[in-house]
UniProtKB/Swiss-Prot annotation:
This is Protein SEY1. Belongs to the TRAFAC class dynamin-like GTPase superfamily. GB1/RHD3 GTPase family. RHD3 subfamily. It is found in: Endoplasmic reticulum membrane. Residues 389-409, 472-492, 803-823 form a coiled coil. Residues 1-26 are annotated as: Disordered. Residues 1-719, 765-827 are cytoplasmic.
Length: 827
């Protein structure tokens, strides 16, 4: 038409050449865009839909804010006229002087404005209207293939499908296009029903526009009649098994609107059209979110093209002849009959052979199922082979699928039980595998389990009619998963056992070296540590390929390498924990005190020291203290004899590495102390603050021992003055000479003198004096009691005294034992 843009020549050639005089609503002429043919009468899809959309409205501003409306109905019923009046488009309309087809194929136009009862701006709605070629036209005659495909295309791509129908057509089957709708519904369900399972809320609105409504029959009654017809059509559809549960309401919503006669009541007709427009511009009245395809307008053009290709290439869409219809009906009837008979027999077999029966023989059961299937198909062939071969074979294939679907349920139940049983037995056996033969034995178990499963599945597969490859694949995946899990468990056990062995050996080595640490102690400890690590690596390293490890579990190189890295990290972590366990603050203090006591209390020969004066005490105290403190630098920092610190191959304090190799997850408290952890040093065993604390305690305890020892020396000196010995010698000279002259006394003096010397040398003189004093006290007490008994002749008193003496004796004996124990401990 004259309004075509010359700048878009490739699109204009497909545009309508009709005069815009067909637009009956006053609107600025330059706003009306020519319609474009989407699909021509030769079933060719127009590639220039997107340029047309770009021309009519900016894509960037449209996005998902658009609506697609299609019209469907018999030829020459005023579909194009309705669209032009309602949406202000310029689709071709019929010349009433010549009753012939006007719209050929499918056309689409952009609605510049919707006609309403009030002046409302609807440009932002971006409504695109598709005018579909009318059905039941004389031009196509019995060739209704395009009509069905066009109707199906409109149904698949639109949000609202306007079904244009005269009031007089309601209640008719062919006249109301119910037969065509049935076929369209059935094919639509087949082609697009599976997507419904994933997108449950998407629907299409069937807007039934009842034309030439006189008003004698209320709209509600007409709506009820049409709804019942649609539901009957839906119930009679041949639905796929997986979609059989879906209802008409899952796919479609219905709404109704009546229009009065255009010629006899033109004013009322326009009012009805405008009222319909009111409903279109009100949000969420007719246009609802779940009607939209949720793709942008440029994506919709691609979606529409793909839909048409799928619809056009589907052979099931060809219009069946009457002969084919009869063949389909009879074959379906025969198929239903033989299937019912099959179902009764199958039900009995299923009840008698439930999964899990211990006496179940898969071979006999498989033969029984094959015979049942063969008998059912033979019964079908006997009755249905007389009809059209293509329909007979098609329905036979459908029957086979239906039988196989039923067999599949039974087959899957048994295969599932068989799979669970096989996996359970395999898991029990795989857990029991240990050692270097794990990989070989796991392969053998996998092969035996898989072979048994496949042989059993073949027996139940109706001579390989039922596919069991998926079940075999799932079983193999489960077995592989179990093997992989057990491989990791065994690999972890190997690493943990090796770490335990390393920890035990390293603990002994560290304890031995640190019992008397020297400058080379840490060299020896590190050498022993590396020896343990090397022993683990050498046992699992491949001879032909250095640096590659194999643990005999069938694990891949990455897993083996990960295990080696885990072992190394754990070994360094164990090294750190062992030295910190052995060299703690308390242990260091104990070790310092032991070294001090060894030097302070005993001489070079290991005999106890007896200090005679404070000079000797002070000298040896300094030497002992220096001897003890000499090990502090060696035990607080792990340094080699070249004064270098021991550095691990891994940062064992890194939280990510600890999580990776030790499985330690950092918590909030650990994250708060992250800065402190960054300052930690592997070689630092005792921190400076801990070191100062230990030295302070050590100083206090050694000073206390020094003071105690010095006090005993001073007491010894002050208690026995030297002049006493001179007085004793002068006053006891005669007695001394008498003893010397008497051999018996002299011998006793020598014996007692030697005994006293021995006690003195062994530092047992004081305990001996305590024992003698106790003995003398006991003798005196007993003598007093005997004297009292002799002088006082009182039997009760004597008995009471005897009891007291006995109790006293027991108490004193216990006290003596305690004193002796204390003295021995002091010694």
């Amino acid at each position: 038409m004259s309004q075509s843009s010359p700048s878009n020549a490739e699109t204009d050639e497909d545009l309508s050449t009709t005069s815009s005089s067909s637009s009956f609503v006053p609107i600025e002429q330059h706003q009306i865009q020519d319609a474009i043919q989407v699909i021509d009468e030769n079933k060719e899809f127009n590639k220039n839909i997107l340029p047309y959309v770009v021309k009519t409205t900016p894509i960037s501003s449209v996005g998902n804010n658009y609506h697609i409306i299609s019209v469907f109905g018999s030829q020459s019923t005023g579909k194009s006229t309705l669209l032009n009046r309602l949406f202000n488009t310029n689709f071709d309309v019929m010349d009433e002087s010549r009753r012939q087809q006007t719209t050929k194929g499918i056309w689409m136009a952009h609605s510049p404005q919707v006609s309403t009862t009030k002046q409302m701006d609807t440009h932002q709605e971006n409504i695109f209207v598709m005018d579909v070629e009318g059905t039941d036209g004389r031009e196509r005659g019995e060739d209704q293939d395009f009509e069905r495909k066009a109707a199906l295309f409109a149904l698949a791509t639109s949000e609202i499908l306007i079904v244009n129908i005269w009031e007089t057509q309601i209640g008719l089957y062919q006249g109301a296009n119910m037969g065509l709708l049935k076929t369209v519904f059935e094919v639509n369900l087949t082609l697009f029903g599976k997507s419904k399972l994933e997108k449950n809320d998407h629907k299409v609105l069937l807007l039934i526009v009842i034309r030439d409504h006189v008003g004698l029959t209320p709209k509600e009654n007409l709506s009820s009649t049409i709804t019942q017809d649609l539901l009957k059509i839906w119930e009679s559809l041949n639905k796929p098994a997986e979609l059989a549960h879906l209802q008409f309401e899952d796919f479609f919503d219905t709404d109704f609107h009546t229009l009065r006669h255009k010629v006899l009541q033109p004013k009322e007709f326009l009012e009805d059209v405008n009222e319909l427009g009111d409903r279109l511009v009100v949000k969420k009245d007719l246009f609802r979110p779940n009607y939209h395809h949720n793709i942008p307008i440029d994506g919709w053009t691609m979606y529409a093209e793909n839909c048409w290709q799928q619809i056009d290439s589907n052979k099931d869409l060809d219009l069946p002849t009457q002969q084919i219809l009869v063949a389909k009906f009879k074959c379906d009837e025969i198929s239903a009959s033989v299937y019912e008979e099959f179902h009764q027999k199958f039900k009995a077999i299923s009840s008698a052979n439930t999964p899990g029966i211990s006496t179940l023989d898969y071979q006999d059961l498989g033969l029984l199922l094959v015979d049942l299937r063969s008998d059912t198909l033979e019964n079908y062939d006997l009755s249905a082979s007389r009809y059209t071969k293509s329909v007979y074979e098609q329905r036979k294939d459908l029957l086979k699928e239906k039988l196989n679907e039923k067999f599949r349920e039974f087959f899957d139940a048994h295969i599932k039980h068989l799979s669970e049983k096989s996996v359970k037995e395999f898991e029990t056996n795989i857990v029991g595998l240990k050692g270097k033969n794990f990989d070989k034995e796991a392969t053998r178990l996998t092969r035996e389990t898989t072979d048994y499963f496949i042989n059993s599945a073949i027996l139940l597969s109706l001579e390989n009619e039922l596919d069991y490859d998926v079940h075999v694949s799932n079983l193999q995946d489960q077995l592989t998963k179990l093997i992989q899990q057990q491989q990791l468990v065994e690999l972890k056990n190997i690493v943990n056992k090796s770490i335990k062995k390393l920890s035990s050996g390293l603990t002994k080595a560290v304890s031995f070296e640190l019992a008397d640490p020297t400058e080379t102690s840490w060299n020896n400890i590190l050498s022993k540590f590396k020896e343990f690590v090397l022993d683990f690596l050498s046992k699992n390293e491949l001879e032909e390929e250095a640096g590659t490890y194999d643990f005999g579990l069938g694990t891949n190189r990455a897993q083996n390498k990960e295990a080696v890295e885990t072992f190394k990290f754990k070994s360094w972590n164990a090294f750190y924990e062992i030295i910190h366990k052995i060299i703690s603050k308390d242990n260091l203090l104990t070790l310092l005190k032991d070294r001090f006591d060894d030097k302070f209390r005993y001489d070079e020969n290991g005999l106890p020291r007896m200090y005679q004066n404070t000079v000797e005490l002070e000298t040896n105290f300094g030497i002992s203290k220096s001897f003890a403190l000499r090990i502090v630098p060696l035990l607080t920092i792990a340094k080699l004899n070249d004064n270098s610190e021991i550095l691990p191959d891994y940062d064992i304090f890194d939280s990510k590495l600890r999580a990776k190799y030790l499985g330690l997850v950092e918590n909030e408290h650990d994250s708060e102390d992250e800065e402190d952890e960054e300052d930690r040093c592997f070689a630092e065993i005792i921190s400076e603050s801990e070191k100062a604390e230990v030295l302070n305690k050590f100083k206090k305890e050694t000073d206390a021992r020094f003071i105690e020892t010095k006090r005993s020396i001073v007491q010894h000196v002050t208690q026995i003055p030297y002049y006493i010995y001179l007085v004793i010698m002068v006053l006891g000279w005669n007695e001394f000479m008498a003893i010397v002259r008497n051999p018996l006394f002299f011998s006793l003096v020598l014996v007692f003198g030697a005994g006293l010397y021995i006690l003195y040398s062994m530092n047992l003189l004081k305990p001996a004096m305590v024992v003698v004093q106790r003995l003398i006290d006991e003798i005196i007490a007993m003598a007093k009691e005997k004297m009292r008994e002799f002088l006082i002749d009182d039997h009760p008193t004597q008995a009471h005294n005897l009891q007291k003496i006995s109790a006293s004796n027991r108490e004193k004996v216990e006290e003596e034992k305690v004193v002796e124990t204390i003295e021995m401990q002091d010694l």
